[in-house]
Amino acid sequence: MKIKNYQPVGVQEERKTIHNLPRNHFVCIIHSSKGTGKTNTVINLIKDYDKTKFFQKVYLFSPSYEADPKYQHLNDGNYDLRVYNDFTNDIFQEVMEDIQADLDEWNHYLYRVKLYEKLQKAKSLKQFTQHDLFQLDEMAYDKPIAPFPCEPFSLICFDDLASNKQLMSQGKSLVNSVLLRCRHFRTSFIYVVQQYRNAVPKMVRANTDLFILAISKSRKDMEAVGEELTSYASLNDIVSMWEKATAEPFSYFVINLMSPNANLRFTRNFDEPLNAV
């Protein structure tokens, strides 16, 4: 018997991306010490995704946003940018309600599309329920207009918030519960941190699909990351590839666990394959 790979109803196919970027919803950790270009990396990542109009909304939580003029480069994207100078559970709840409202609006549009298609084939209005007829009347019996160019995908980025206890809770938290269901919300997450194990909750680390790692002078920090990825490569190989990838200025070691090509799982800056020495 041939086993089919069924996908959730209503979910679009993977979207186009450039380089070796994940083509679906992801959780990303950008780990970089001070002065190694974290902000620059975030901007490049978001802009590369924007080249294919991947995200419709970007929510940036960053207390240093106004003090860092580089972030102004994000203002000219094809997405709707929302910026927050702090993180609280209440603010995050509002963000998730906004995301859910967009998805509900999109799903209602899809329902109306099917209703309109049924109308084109129908021989009588008796085939429709009262609710359907009410919807058709609101549509003026015309083809519905899409509220967005495509199903709304969102990105939530947390930058410079390692000390925020509501966000970085090691136990149950609002963010952690949402992150586990990020694909249902069509939402990706980016955590930008200077420390790894002591800052990022274990649950987040265990569900990360994409690691972007800058040069590190601490083998201890490198091993802290590598020890959690030994099912993909040995600890020594991960450290060796990390050192090789970041030997040149502004180069990053990228671990993309979502890559459909195993040869591009470990790369320098997404598109230069690395092999364990």
Predicted feature descriptions by range:
Residues 98-101, 222-261:
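P-loop/Walker A phosphate-binding loop and immediately adjacent motor/lid segment at beta-alpha junctions
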Residues 73-79, 226-231, 270-272:
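Generic alpha-helical propensity signal that fires on short helical segments
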Residues 14-16, 26-48, 63-65, 111-237:
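Conserved P-loop NTPase motor cores
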Residues 60, 158, 255-256:
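Hydrophobic side chains in beta-strands
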